[in-house]
Amino acid sequence: NATMLIEYAIEGRRRVKEQLKIMAGIEFADVNLGYIDEETDQETVISVPEQTSNSLVPDTKLPAGHIFGVGKSSISNEMCIYRLENKTVKGTGKMETQGVNQKNVKESVNAAWQFFQSNARQIIPGVKVHNKDYLLYYADTQGKGLSEEVSLAEFVGLCSALAERPTIESLAVAGELKLSGTLEELTHIEDIMRVCKNAGAKRILLPMDAIRDIQNVDRELLNYVQPIFYNDPIDAAKKALDIY
């Protein structure tokens, strides 16, 4: 009947808007579509069956070792959000990865791994890093190609897996950790905040230097995504894991 056809058409249009919301800017944040019955004046909003939640980042605690990182895709150059799933098993201190094929991304993951081996005890005192093996699945959640800019998130994820302690809820991490142990200067703060909002993240870890750039960020983004500032990678991990 006519109602079924209308709802089918609106459902298709909403799927398009859901994808635009993920890929594009804040102008696509409102995805609700529906119709008003002229006879009853009743408004009906059409949902998408598979979109029980339109958030990539859930508003609940993730399993220990799982974390979301934000960075530019090394293929499309778009700012994206990625899910890094780390777990530990009994072993001898080796690391294996799945989903990591590009050389620059492998180097980024290795930077996180090297820093983790040297510094995990500063976050989890007394822990024995080399009594475990570490497994990483790097999920390209938006299908844009992997990023080499989420190495800080991977370091935090490794700490979370080893400590068997989840990160705080609805968190994304921004920051590129280099092999030297230093952090790359973070730019495009507003783009990072927008991607986090569109993905459903309520909190974002940012370096202390980003405070000066926050002043220029759209107020609506700041009302939705709470910035949490860190001084260095150790501080970032402690704040992500709520360890003080």
Predicted regions mapped to residue ranges:
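Peripheral, non-AAA+ core regions of ATP-driven protein-machinery
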Residues: 26-244
